[in-house]
Swiss-Prot record:
NCBIfam families: S15_bact. The lineage of its organism: Bacteria, Bacillati, Actinomycetota, Actinomycetes, Kitasatosporales. SUPFAM superfamilies: S15/NS1 RNA-binding domain. It comes from the Bacteria. This is Small ribosomal subunit protein uS15.
Length: 95
């Protein structure tokens, strides 16, 4: 499940540090979080969709690795992002 261009652009402008910023960890984590929430809603109605469940686990792992990287590089940015997205610290992978 992919995001449509309008939603993606809105997330990029909200979490980006400058115009056209698509590669910062904050933007990447925000995009992954949106895809994760969309897939979670999909799996609530389609319980036996195991291919999508595997995709969800892959996305969660990618987000966890990006959050670990951000926590290692800049703990203040990590804490601000976790607070903005409402992610649990244990799910974020850093203490």
């Amino acid at each position: 499940m992919s995001l449509d261009a309008a939603v993606k652009k809105q997330i990029i402008t909200e979490f980006g540090t400058k115009e056209g910023d698509t590669g910062s960890p904050e933007v990447q984590v925000a995009l992954l979080s949106r895809r994760i929430s969309d897939l979670t809603e999909h799996l609530k109605t389609h319980k036996h969709d195991h291919h999508s469940r595997r995709g969800l686990l892959i996305l969660v792992g990618q987000r966890r690795r990006l959050l670990q990287y951000l926590a290692k590089k800049d703990i203040q940015r990590f804490r601000a992002l976790v607070e903005r997205l409402g992610i649990r610290r244990g799910a974020a992978g850093a203490r």
